[in-house]
Amino acid sequence: MDRKSSVTIDLLRLGVMDTDAASANHHRIAENIGADPNRLADWEHHLETCCDPDLALNVLAELAQDSAQCLGEVLDHDASACRLVRLLGASSELGRHLIAHPDDLAEVIRDPVRLGHDEICDDLLEVVGAHKEGEFTVAGTPTGPASDRLRLANRRHLVRIASRDVSADDPTEIIEDVAAELADLADGIVTAALALARADCPDHADARLAIIAMGKCGAQELNYISDVDVMYVAEPANDDVSGASAVTIATKLAASVARMCSAHSGAGSIWQVDAALRPEGNAGPLVRTMDSMRTYYEKWAKNWEFQALLKARPMAGDLDLGQRFVEMVSPMVWQVGEAEGFVPETRAMRTRVVSLIAAKNKGREIKLGAGGLRDVEFTAQLLQLVHGRQDESLRVRATLPALRALAAGGYISRGAAERLKEAYRLERVMEHRVQMFRLRRTHLLPDDEDGLRRLARAVGLRTADEVRRVWTATSKAVLRAHGQVFYSPVVEAVARIPTQDLRMSAEAAKVRLSALGFHDEDAGLRHIEALTSGTSRAVRIQTALMPAMLAWLADGPSPDHGLLAFRQVSEALGESPWYLRALRDEGAMAQRLAVVLSTSRYAVDVLTRAPETVQVLVDDDLTPLSREDLARQMNAVARRHHDVEEAVGAIRAVRRRKLFRILVADILNVTGIRRIGQALTDLTGATIDAALTAVSREVEDAPPIGIVAMGRWGGQELSYASDADCLFVVGDGPGVGEKALKIVTKLRNLLGKHGADPAVVLDADLRPEGRSGPMVRSLESYRKYYGKWSSTWESQALLRASHGAGDRELTNELLEYVDQVRYPADGLTGSQLAEIRKLKARMESERIPRGVDPRRHLKLGPGGLSDIEWTAQIIQLQHAGHDPALRTTSTIDALNAALAAGYIDEGQHAKLCDSWLAASRLRNAIMVVRGRPSDVIPSDSTDLDVIAKASGMGQGASEHLVEDHLRHCRRASRVVDAVFWNQ
């Protein structure tokens, strides 16, 4: 056998199909780069692992003829030779680019690592000669030539990225990273195109333009060739420019960017920029202001539009403006899961997409077909939008991170998540390879043998039949997981319950959950499966408890949230012996846990941060502890720690348990609203007292410090969301103030920092001179200030002043002195009364958020908390100087004293007290249920139903809840008009 025949056989073994052409190309390459044509070069062994050896050899022969030196530099190194051979076998279009631009072979030689986002952007801006003009980046070269340079630079970066991609031993392992870098490249292209657009627009500096990436680009999971979905938001760059002018300018810029990215020239093209996802689609304006966007999404947007916004990301232009847009729409995105018809609409949309696939393409659609990429994406997005309302870990843009988060949160089984992730990675690699070949936008499997064989080799297979089999198996696996999660999953019912007659089929369990009042039966089944699968002791206890737990959870306002929380707490504590024993043996504990979990996100937040707090539920006596008992416990744990931070941490741990105890008593209706306010006041005072003692240990000769409680703390009326308003007072003496300030500063920092328990915020803004005044004052300083300079509003604020914490002698001395200020002997002058009324009116107009119905504002609305409190206080300021019975910090006690003295009649008293108590209960209930403070009654009917049921009003009583509040307020408002406003 001659050497030529030997080379041909070797090439055939490496996978070439046309041996004559391959042999001829081999000889052309060898002759041009000075190699031996009678034997295979070392680099040629890499043909075995490339997608199309014939194509690779053909392009290499062209390069050898025209750019032998450049090619030789690549082939001299095994790693770069491997990258080049694989690249040329995978992409005929990038091969043609390298023939025309051999200098870009340097991208194959370079170290195959991902470039940073800023590196790519800076490189592309340099390509167009961009520079800063004020705050804007503007290209410095003519648009035409610069546009072509940008197109060529895009190809250069694609050569670099694709070289890294195809040289990976397993491309599915880096697909996430490659897709993210392609999105970075898109950001850079659009950024450079915008710089070019600004160069052609003389008045560009009058408009801020944010370009928002949507779809795969927004999620940073972009393809090689894909439409880049965008939206445009604009604002005037300065006050002299109108919104309309800014939109006009920004529209020119946006259109120019789209043209540059989409246009074809001798240098090729980049990709289409598609703004069809914008409000009103192609029928709507290309660019909108932030206000216009907000109006559209608040009033007219459809559910699917919020699903699309899940992937919104600022990509170019004014990134701050873009981020503001994303933050503006984000709350709406995470509310759409509650929208009427959202789930059936999402399912119908997916079904419709599949039905529209052309018959000839069925079975070949990698993206849209049954079992394709879209099934994985829609599965993840549906679960994200349904459960992401309360679980922020699900608020991610990309599919793979979403699947990871869903599995971690228990919303999808780990096995299903792994199957979906594995399939998604493989299908994305397939999609990338069919696009890479000619750099054309396609999502179809090849329908020819050569194309299928090329794709097979790209994913580690050999033949067309193999890739067909893998595609079929993968799409079927996706369909199975998608069907279980997205539609109606069939899960073993309540697992293997020891009592035979409690064993149910999956459908029976689903029906039971629905009958009990659970809304998301599929999620419920997943949680039950997670808690009752296996053979461990913990599982046996959970399995025995599950039927009762489901019934107790269903009795609560939010069964679905309760079941999820029960799973989270159980997974955190399931192996703890005391928890298992309590679940099994303490029926009251299990029932209380169910009620708490299904009622209160606030309680769940405390529990999930510190699951051991659940031990509180074992205690039958939930009567709030006295301040003295709290102080003893806190001081005892603090003394066990020499380190001050550890001591305060231990104090806060006690507070966390006692706060949860108060919450439980509230949720179970063991304690009324006034007792809750007192309990929270005592807990806050004891916490601050113990922490002050601990922090003072650190300062030598620490001076006594008194803390005067103000506001709701001083009135013994704290709510769950209240800060601790206060004043800090020390005795007179040299150096006392400096030491006291050091102690107070550390005290506020240690109690105010975020931790497993809610922070205690010590707010001293009511101090003399407010924030501009000293944090700590001596007794004498307070006397001078209140004796000479205090304002009427400060006299009013002092009506709430009482001992809060620290040295009681100091606080008592200060309180005794300010009695003359807050209880003026002659009452209020006419001007003082007018001043108070004017301040009240201004607060109402300034502090009620725009767009909020004042009637739904619990604090500042007509007949709300502020109206009633100020009415009581104006009576105190007028008459407490000569009527000691009015000298109280409590609103209700002040109203009681006013009734006894005849300043209000029984009807007025009842209306004011009823409204104040009802509003206080409702404000606490909102915090308990939603886990976040709000002075506004929610407009969401789902939340209102939960709050109503948590308030003891029954299921579906949201309308009654609002009507009850409005009725109380109307009655109280009439009294306020008569007493406070004298109308």
UniProtKB/Swiss-Prot annotation:
What does the record give as EC number?
2.7.7.89, 2.7.7.42
Task: Give the InterPro entries listed for this entry.
Answer: GlnE (IPR023057), GlnE_rpt_dom (IPR005190), NT_sf (IPR043519), PII_UdlTrfase/GS_AdlTrfase (IPR013546)
Q: Which reaction does it catalyse?
A: [glutamine synthetase]-O(4)-(5'-adenylyl)-L-tyrosine + phosphate = [glutamine synthetase]-L-tyrosine + ADP; [glutamine synthetase]-L-tyrosine + ATP = [glutamine synthetase]-O(4)-(5'-adenylyl)-L-tyrosine + diphosphate
Which residue ranges are recorded for the region named Adenylyl transferase?
496-983
Q: Name one GO biological process term.
A: regulation of glutamine family amino acid metabolic process
Keyword rRNA-binding listed: no
Molecular functions (GO terms): [glutamate-ammonia-ligase] adenylyltransferase activity; [glutamine synthetase]-adenylyl-L-tyrosine phosphorylase activity; ATP binding; magnesium ion binding
Which cofactors go with this protein?
Mg(2+)
Source superkingdom: Bacteria
The entry's family comment says:
Belongs to the GlnE family.
What is the documented function of this protein? Involved in the regulation of glutamine synthetase GlnA, a key enzyme in the process to assimilate ammonia. When cellular nitrogen levels are high, the C-terminal adenylyl transferase (AT) inactivates GlnA by covalent transfer of an adenylyl group from ATP to specific tyrosine residue of GlnA, thus reducing its activity. Conversely, when nitrogen levels are low, the N-terminal adenylyl removase (AR) activates GlnA by removing the adenylyl group by phosphorolysis, increasing its activity.
Name assigned to this protein: Bifunctional glutamine synthetase adenylyltransferase/adenylyl-removing enzyme
Query: Which organism is this protein's natural source?
Result: Cutibacterium acnes (strain DSM 16379 / KPA171202) (Propionibacterium acnes)
Upper lineage = Bacteria, Bacillati, Actinomycetota, Actinomycetes, Propionibacteriales
